[in-house]
Amino acid sequence: MLDGYTIKVVKLPPDNEETAIQGLKLLVELLDRYPENIIDSPPRRHLDETVLELVEKSETPVAMQLKEELKGLTEGGIAIKRVVFLMPIRGVERFYFLLIQDKKDPAYYGKIVTPKDTDKVLMRWKVSDNEYRVIYGDLHAETVTKEKLAELEAALPK
């Protein structure tokens, strides 16, 4: 180790439903809404890069706190703070990408579902031939049959 330097170890959260919900919760706290897309928003950009741009314009308490905590930090300090703070958001992105990779038929409706939509599907993925896991707009989750999912998705705003 070099004198005068500190090594910061950042542990990645697991790529699972719980991490995705934590990341979605943080997104709402930062932006007061869900992002329109989780992946490719725009193409070849990470979700947290897009979020950082949106946070600059946001006046939610959590966004204001983050901006205040970044004041006076060195460039390296800002980078570390952002990585640690935004880790749950990267978790949403990684989990969704894993669902795509594993061919779990995921879908995300952040463009039309809000945190107030307690009965609307925000995100879903296949867990078996006849069942899907659903995260609703208020971030509660449950397993539903594919028939129930079809009803829920038919009720989404157009």
Task: Please report, for each region that a protein language model flagged, where it lies by residue.
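Conserved hydrophobic/amphipathic alpha-helical signal-anchor segments
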Residues: 1-120, 130-132, 137-158
